């Protein structure tokens, strides 16, 4: 599955890091808004204030964590593309596993193995879903009849004579 809209590798890292930061900040903001609202004292003003405080406190931290994950994943993915010389789903699966292992390195080897397995499985599921979606979408639009590129291969049909002589304008 090739992605034609992706940036070249050095800029892909920055692009993915920024996208992950945005996704983490927005998603974390929504989650923290709900969490802050539920954990605040009774009263609309208290709940709204608690919700806003939770958003301001935790959403940027979650965005930063997502950005670290996205940047590290993209760096490993670009390195895999450079080393292997091809861009396929195995690069993403391996990058997800290595990213999970590296980010869990401070917690010991058992946590590294668990995070590597989760990262690899998660990325394998994402890549598999992308491949299935592409196959399903391409089956919706079957190829039409193939046209010959060389006009001499076409069967000769006799056109009616033209009132303008033997000149065939629309052949």
Swiss-Prot record:
Posttranslational modification: Degraded by YMEL1 downstream of the integrated stress response (ISR).
Protein name, per record: Mitochondrial import inner membrane translocase subunit Tim17-A
GO cellular component, one term: nucleoplasm
Superkingdom, taxonomy of origin: Eukaryota
The species this protein was found in: Homo sapiens (Human)
Membrane topology, from the record: Multi-pass membrane protein
GO biological process, any: intracellular protein transport
Subcellular location: Mitochondrion inner membrane
Disulfide bond positions: 9-78
Keywords: Disulfide bond, Membrane, Mitochondrion, Mitochondrion inner membrane, Protein transport, Translocation, Transmembrane, Transmembrane helix, Transport
Function in brief: Essential component of the TIM23 complex, a complex that mediates the translocation of transit peptide-containing proteins across the mitochondrial inner membrane.
Lineage of origin: Eukaryota, Metazoa, Chordata, Craniata, Vertebrata
Entry similarity comment: Belongs to the Tim17/Tim22/Tim23 family.
